[in-house]
């Protein structure tokens, strides 16, 4: 039996940052994740993808962000159980929980924070005949190693941030990048849309809108695509076709825990602390939903911070926590290390 203050289900960026915030409150964390390594989608699906909206980082690769978070939480000595999925939860008479994994490992904690960790992401696939045949033969739903597309002809389909960001990134890798979207308007960040337009004007990206890919051709590998543009059909040659229409997460066994579910996400009380309808169980990051929800990493960091404050009250009933700033109090690691806050220097006015 693994005992901890907070059992975090999910080793993605939100779950990892929750360890840091909990550590500042002297709360011990253990992380459970179905994937074999920490990082969640960042490590599993796109470790080499640049991220542009992390405060203080004009650009950071997803994998590097994970490395930074792991370094940041090392001082708080979190436990990790990777490659196992949360299966069942049992509430105890004292209000604590026992969670059992699919491999029989048991965890005992007064607080559970669900931050993903389900290990199951289904890409939304376009309705194209025989597309399954070409999977791993030129059709890719994720980009883990951009170098695979070095000097290749790549067609990306989609209108969101992933399609825009990868088109921008691969413009300097592939020999030819074509972005296809069924509408003239994109739903990604305005800055990314403007960058794609700049690259189009510079001849580094071909933009085809409104259009859809309706067929794939090739004997053993993708050789060309059939597209429909303004009612007319034509063929474009390519080496890789990457449809980026988003991911559908699967809640798995957690969906049977009695939590309120809305559109495959866990409903939480965002006005307070991101707690679910079961006291002591929180949901943070992309796995939750509430009015005004934004699926952004930085929003997950905020949710993790408030969750830890509420968890402190559950774990230490009746004990008031006084907020301290790390710039004043420093950081005391569970491993005996201490990061000192800079001492204020006061000079007398002569």
From Swiss-Prot:
EC number: 1.18.1.2
Name of this protein: Ferredoxin--NADP reductase
An MF annotation (GO) of this entry: NADP binding
Top enzyme category: oxidoreductase
Substrates-to-products reaction catalysed: 2 reduced [2Fe-2S]-[ferredoxin] + NADP(+) + H(+) = 2 oxidized [2Fe-2S]-[ferredoxin] + NADPH
SUPFAM superfamilies cross-referenced by the UniProt entry: FAD/NAD(P)-binding domain
Species for this entry: Flavobacterium johnsoniae (strain ATCC 17061 / DSM 2064 / JCM 8514 / BCRC 14874 / CCUG 350202 / NBRC 14942 / NCIMB 11054 / UW101)
Entry's cofactor comment: Binds 1 FAD per subunit.
PANTHER family the record matches: THIOREDOXIN REDUCTASE 1-RELATED-RELATED
